[in-house]
Amino acid sequence: MITLRKLPIALAVAAGVLSTQAMAVDFHGYARSGIGWTASGGEQQCFQTTGAQSKYRLGNECETYAELKLGQELWKEGDKSFYLDTNVAYSVSQRDDWESTDPAFREANVQGKNLIESLPGSTIWAGKRFYQRHDVHMIDFYYWDISGPGAGLETIDLGFGKLSVAATRNSESGGSSAWIDNQRENAKYTINNVYDVRLAGLETNPGGSLELGVDYGRADTQEGYSLAPNASKDGVMLTAEHTQSLMGGFNKFVVQYATDSMTSYNTGHSQGTSVNNNGHLLRVIDHGAINLAEKWDMMYVALYQDIDLDNNNGNTWYSVGVRPMYKWTPIMSTLLEAGYDNVKSQHTGERNGQYKLTLAQQWQAGDSIWSRPAIRVFATYANWDEKWGYSDTTGVAQDGTIGTNSRGKNNEVTFGAQFEAWW
């Protein structure tokens, strides 16, 4: 029993322990928000080529978005540890003061490091997780991303490289059916499992390394349920990525090939219940960020992606862009982003094209093109000519703007201010 005399001491010790634990909580995240206008009137418009899977993002983001991550090392003994990581994401239209939205629970996982004596340096994990994602920042395009609920063992040291294995899951609405009480009933959802194997850190040349990956995705129906007869069911995605240190930064060269269920989402997620994604995908990307001179940095990307589908509803996407940055002082810079997208329809043979230019004056926490937080004012000009779009009723590509999501031919100017931060 704690006497009254000892109570203040006990409370002080407890407060100290709780304070230490509170200080150990890691707070990380990403956020962006701002305000913008369109020269012809109204709120800021954003510009993305019909058929392209992303857009050049500088001065071309029309939403408030945030990811708030809380994590803590829950236990540590020597080099062994358990770490809890969570992430809640929000996205709203940034039109009003009060904008309510349901948050997306993106991550909740525990990672155990060095728990397997025979595999020093490895990490075992389970839960929802952003898993080893690969992206092109300037177009916000995640080309290798199997994130979701899952489990795995990563960074197994083989001597010549690091091996990682994982299984993750996502679902499709409906997708399968069964005879129940003498009638056909559709499932509310059908899950897709992805099995991922990666070998990273393969030294190829001075300053260069190679990462190889295989992803197999398959629809997994409930007992008694079956997919449509012509559903893609499963597919494979192969990835090879070479990373080279270059001019104070890096260059990444990526080649990916995918089949059937792995073609429609084409970042690593599977859609095996679909009847419209049998075919194959080939993607080649070269992107990076370099230091050109004492006061100059630059991001760049060149992308080719061909989705050849059996139903003739695929497309071929070309994209090229640069974002040079001139640093007036260690905390103030000017950026120019120039990007061009062109998408050819497999069905119609027609093309959609757009070029987009953004000039931004920026104040950032440091003199790197990656320095954040940043506050920027910007002006954007976009010019597009679209010959085809996807039908509003069937989803099949067709010529013209009537009854499709084609934007036709036009141009526009927008301007505004935005902050962006990661921490």
From Swiss-Prot:
Pfam families given in the database record: LamB
Membrane topology classification: Multi-pass membrane protein
Keyword Transmembrane: yes
Annotated site residue numbers, Greasy slide, important in sugar transport: 30, 65, 98, 250, 370, 422
Keywords, sorted A to Z: Cell outer membrane, Ion transport, Membrane, Porin, Signal, Sugar transport, Transmembrane, Transmembrane beta strand, Transport
Gene3D superfamilies for this protein: Porin, LamB type
Induction pattern: By maltose.
GO MF annotation, one: carbohydrate transmembrane transporter activity
Catalytic activity: beta-maltose(in) = beta-maltose(out)
Site (Important in sugar transport): 142
Any one biological process term the GO annotation gives: polysaccharide transport
NCBIfam families referenced in this protein's UniProt entry, alphabetically: PRK09360.1
Similarity comment: family membership: Belongs to the porin LamB (TC 1.B.3) family.
Protein purpose: Involved in the transport of maltose and maltodextrins.
PANTHER family hit by this protein: CRYPTIC OUTER MEMBRANE PORIN BGLH-RELATED (PTHR38762:SF1)
Assembly with partners or alone: Homotrimer formed of three 18-stranded antiparallel beta-barrels, containing three independent channels.
Database matches in HAMAP family: LamB (MF_01301)
Protein name as catalogued: Maltoporin 1
Organism: Yersinia pestis
